[in-house]
Amino acid sequence: MFRSLSAIAVALAAAAIAPGASAQTQSQTPAPLSPDKAAFRALYKELVETNTTLSSGSCTLAVERMAERLKAAGLPAADMQILAPADRPKDGNLIAVLRGTDRKAKPIMLLAHVDVVEAKRADWERDPFTLVEENGYFYARGASDDKAMAAAFTDAMVRYASEGFKPRRDIKLALTCGEETPDTFNGVGWLIANHRDLMDAEFALNEGAGGRLDATGKPVFVGVQAGEK
C-alpha cells in the first residue's frame, strides 16, 4: 500500500505546523501551538481567507499581505516586487529574493500559485473562505491547492529573513496568479515573457511533481516536473 503526497509541501509544512494540513490524531483539546507554529497558522489562515477567485477575488491583495509579512521579518523592500499587467491589476504576482553569499551560483526558486478555483457558497457545507479545522482536517477553498504550499514557502522565507540566514544561493519566492485559469491569464507565462530575469533559476520547487511513501512512511521516490502549463 502506498500513500501519495506533494513531497516538497509536506516536508516544509511538517516543521511549521502542529495540527497538519491533512490528518492528525483526533483530540477534543489539542495542545497549544508553539510560537513558530502559531505564526505559520496565522499566515496560512490569512492567505486561505483572502479570496483569490477570478470572478470576485484579488491575487494582488493576497500577495501584498504575504509581502508585508516578509517585510516585517526583515526582508528588504528592494528585494520584493509585486507585478501585474496594467489591464489586470488584481492578478498580481510576488517575487521576493533572499540574497545568498555566492553571486555566481544560480538561484533556487520556490514557486506556488495563490489563485483558486471558483467556490459557490451554496455548494459548500461551510463558508469556503473561512478556514475551519474539524477532526484534524482543514476545510476551505485553497486549503490544499495551492495555498498550503504557498504558505509553507512564505513561512520558510519569513523564518530565514527573521533569523538572518544567509544561503549560498539566492532563494527566490514566486507567488503567482492564474494557474487555475491559464486560458484567461497565466502569471508564470506572463512573468517569463515580461520579467524573465526575475524568473531565472537553477531549478524550481513547485506543486506539479510529487512522490510516494510506503505504508511505513519510508520515501519510495520523488517525481520531477519537467514543464509547467
Sequence positions of predicted segments:
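Positively charged n-region of N-terminal signal peptides that target proteins for export
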Residues: 1-4, 77
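Serine residues within intrinsically disordered or low-complexity segments
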Residues: 4-6, 22, 27
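Bacterial N-terminal signal peptides
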Residues: 7-20
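Active-site-proximal flexible loops/turns
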Residues: 9, 58, 119-122, 152, ...
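Metal-dependent amide/peptide-bond hydrolase catalytic core
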Residues: 24-28, 69, 77, 210-216, ...
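Acidic/His- and Gly-rich active-site-bordering loop/insert found
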Residues: 25-143, 150, 160-169
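Short Gly/Pro-enriched turn/cap motifs at secondary-structure boundaries
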Residues: 84-87, 224-229
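Acidic/histidine-rich catalytic neighborhood of metal-dependent amide-processing enzymes
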Residues: 137-138, 144-226
